[in-house]
Design a protein with these regions (language model features):
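Non-catalytic substrate-recognition and accessory regions of acyl/acetyltransferase enzymes
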Residues: 1-156
């Protein structure tokens, strides 16, 4: 994965983002510390797919902060500007709040001003009585879009 252009990213991000150990971090006005990761995911495709993760590092309760949404959008936008790849997002299941996270992510995406550039598909995988929500995000301009969607559907 190509490293992000932090100058460009921070121009668009409400919160200042910095890179640390191949991760991206920011702290909110409410002192909530977030860590964003992009990990190669070879479960569906052999290459070119990354899994996106958002982690509340200090476990502080995060109020409804629109600047978090704007920062996450800027980070995802920067991902696609530097890496025209496939992005997967799987909601964390440890606290049984994955459905809420999936709804929030879908809401953020539906409100995103550049959403017409992207294709998103959210699916639910049932595994051992746990619902796993996974989202596929890919640019509509990707020449392999139809193959990517077919492969994702076959996997699900």
């Amino acid at each position: 994965m190509q490293t992000f252009n932090l100058t460009r990213l921070n121009f668009h991000s409400p919160y200042k983002v910095w890179a640390e150990d191949n991760e991206y971090k920011f702290i909110t006005d409410y002192e909530v510390s977030y860590r964003i990761i992009f990990s190669p995911n070879n479960d569906i495709w052999k290459e070119g797919a990354y899994e996106f993760g958002i982690f509340n590092e200090n476990q502080k309760i995060s109020p409804n902060d629109p600047k978090v949404k704007g920062t996450v959008e800027a980070i995802i936008e920067e991902f696609f500007l530097t890496n025209p790849n496939i992005l997967l997002y799987q909601c964390e299941t440890g606290d049984n709040r994955q459905a809420m996270r999936a709804r929030l992510f879908a809401k953020w995406f539906n409100e995103y001003e550049n959403k017409s550039r992207f294709f998103i598909k959210v699916s639910v995988l049932h595994d051992d009585d746990i619902d796993n929500y996974i989202a596929l995000i890919v640019q509509k301009s990707n020449p392999e879009l139809n193959n990517i969607l077919q492969t994702f559907n076959d996997f699900i």
